[in-house]
Amino acid sequence: MKMVRAILRPEWTEEVTDGLAEAGYYSLTKINVFGRGKQKGITVGDVHYDELAKTMIMMAVEDEAVDKVIKIISGKAYTGNMGDGKIFVNTIEAAYTISSGEKGL
């Protein structure tokens, strides 16, 4: 199992989650976050914003689904500009359903 975390522009969140749902990936968590990447914030006129509003999507997926999920997220969130976001993938050692105690996704 893998944990896929994507940091996205908030305006693309619905497009990404709809694309994932259309492909059968319904289970996810969305969190509104603030952060900055390589661009170190943004300057608009005389005002510099150190951190920008983003959305983080977290999904636990089977190993064989990772490439497809990344392709969907990347395709739906892409503008070609700095600030499009970042995707992180980590290994999950185990997952348990709290209500049943069942192990796995």
Curated annotation (Swiss-Prot):
GO terms for cellular component: cytosol. It holds the Pfam family P-II. SMART domains: P-II (SM00938). GO terms for biological process: nitrogen fixation; regulation of nitrogen utilization. The keyword GTP-binding does not apply. The keyword Transcription applies. Coiled coil: none annotated. GO terms for molecular function: ATP binding; enzyme regulator activity. Keywords: Nitrogen fixation, Transcription, Transcription regulation. InterPro entries: N-reg_PII, N-reg_PII-like_a/b, N-reg_PII/ATP_PRibTrfase_C, N-reg_PII_CS. Belongs to the P(II) protein family. PANTHER family: NITROGEN REGULATORY PROTEIN P-II (PTHR30115), PII-LIKE PROTEIN GLNBI (PTHR30115:SF13). Could be involved in the regulation of nitrogen fixation. This is Nitrogen fixation nifHD2 region GlnB-like protein 1. The lineage of its organism: Archaea, Methanobacteriati, Methanobacteriota, Stenosarchaea group, Methanomicrobia.
